[in-house]
Amino acid sequence: MSDNSIEEKVRSIIVDQLGVESDKVTADAKFIEDLGADSLDTVELVMAFEENFDIEVPDEEAEKLQSVADVVAYIEKVQG
């Protein structure tokens, strides 16, 4: 999967999960600070990423995923 399609899919998941407008979901947007997510939202986001990308995100890694760019980089790393 190309970088752009990963980012597009991540952005789409965030829009669906958080109910935010797509133009607010930028690469640097932080889930809690910029997109209004709470801790439950972030858990649900990680679960959605795991399901949609067929990956497993350990809790210690999930805590590091705070922005769109963080998630895209992590998915690229684990999908090799």
Swiss-Prot record:
Broad class of the protein's primary localization: cytoplasm
Pfam families documented for this protein: PP-binding
Domain of life: Bacteria
PTM section of the record: 4'-phosphopantetheine is transferred from CoA to a specific serine of apo-ACP by AcpS. This modification is essential for activity because fatty acids are bound in thioester linkage to the sulfhydryl of the prosthetic group.
Record's signal peptide: none
One GO term of the biological process aspect: lipid A biosynthetic process
UniProt GO cellular component terms: cytosol; membrane
Segments forming domain Carrier: 4-79
Modified residues (O-(pantetheine 4'-phosphoryl)serine): S39
Cell compartment(s), UniProt: Cytoplasm
GO MF terms held by the record: acyl binding; acyl carrier activity
Record pathway: Lipid metabolism; fatty acid biosynthesis
InterPro entries named among the record's database cross-references: ACP, ACP-like_sf, PP-bd_ACP, Ppantetheine_attach_site
Keyword annotations from UniProtKB, A to Z: Cytoplasm, Fatty acid biosynthesis, Fatty acid metabolism, Lipid biosynthesis, Lipid metabolism, Phosphopantetheine, Phosphoprotein
Function text: Carrier of the growing fatty acid chain in fatty acid biosynthesis.
Family: Belongs to the acyl carrier protein (ACP) family.
Record-given protein name: Acyl carrier protein
